[in-house]
Structures are given as C-alpha cells and as structure tokens.
C-alpha cells in the first residue's frame, strides 16, 4: 500500500508546472498553472475563467471566457481565445413574463479572417408581434456582421465581451420596439486564419 502511494508521489514529483497566459487582447495576465510530464501534453487543453477573474470587476462575474493552449514559450503556455458564454443564472434572471425574447445565431468573419459563431439576444419590455421580431433579428445580424467585417478578431472580441457591441444593438433595435436588454449571449471561434495555424504548429514544437 505504502509502495503504491510512494509511486504516485514520485510520479507527481516528476511533473513540471507551467504558467497559463492569456492572449494579448486580455493583457497577457495569468490564467493559473497546470502540471505535466511534458509541455506537449498541455497543447490543446481548454481553460475556462470569468471576465471578473481578469479584471477584478465583480459586475462581470457572469461572463465566462474560454481559452485553448496552443503553444509554449519555455514554461509559459500561450493561449488563444476560443469563445465566451453568459452564465445560465444570469440569463434566467433577465427573463420576464409577458415579454419577448429574440435570438439570432449565425457566423461572421472578422477583418483578419477569423470565423466566429455568434448568438445575439434581445429582450423586449412587452410581447411584440412576429413582424417586429423579424425586424429586430435583422438589425442584430446586420449590426454584428458589419462590426466583425470592420474589426480585427482581437478588437471584435473586446467589443463582445465588454458589452459594447450589445449596447450598439440595443440602441439600434429600440427604435423598433421598447427593449429591456440586449446581449451577445455566446460566441465560438470556428476557424482561424490558415497562416496563424501554421505558426502555432511551428512554435509548439519547442519546449524551450
């Protein structure tokens, strides 16, 4: 029994700790650390945190951020932002009886070639007609698509996670019907530029 326990401890001691670093768009702050026998074992791992953990602003605790470890620089694990999602509890808190919810899910391409699936959400103050929902959904799509085409992926990411794009949608759609809230409920990166993928493959070979 003790021999087995000793073996487990010995294996744990053989592991090395690596620091997980956020992308430049999030200030390259620490996302924590992870152990591994070899740095190549960490590549591809998914990391979850909240915007609150990065900014210290408790009002952003419901914004969940997802990153993927794509390469390393010595003991530092470099990540890429791969999406975000608002917490279910927060979304439930927005729902009201006798109001309408307008969702729109579609793919956009940023100025620098990232393909991102975006889920927009608008909540009206009262129940609205189907024609009004259609008009609201059209504006959601147009606003997000235009913003994505004009911005790099990093800039688009900031517009999304810090709520600025949602505010723009709110201002544009409130002209159709009284609104309570607009949000970018979820994003997911579907494709990165081909040249970036090749750079990642090259840099992840070295363990420093």
From Swiss-Prot:
The keyword ATP-binding does not apply. It comes from Saccharolobus islandicus (strain L.S.2.15 / Lassen #1) (Sulfolobus islandicus). GO terms for cellular component: ribonucleoprotein complex; ribosome. Disulfide bonds: none annotated. Keywords: Ribonucleoprotein, Ribosomal protein. The keyword Ribosomal protein applies. GO terms for molecular function: structural constituent of ribosome. This is Small ribosomal subunit protein eS1. GO terms for biological process: translation. Belongs to the eukaryotic ribosomal protein eS1 family. It comes from the Archaea. The lineage of its organism: Archaea, Thermoproteota, Thermoprotei, Sulfolobales, Sulfolobaceae. InterPro entries: Ribosomal_eS1, Ribosomal_eS1_arc.
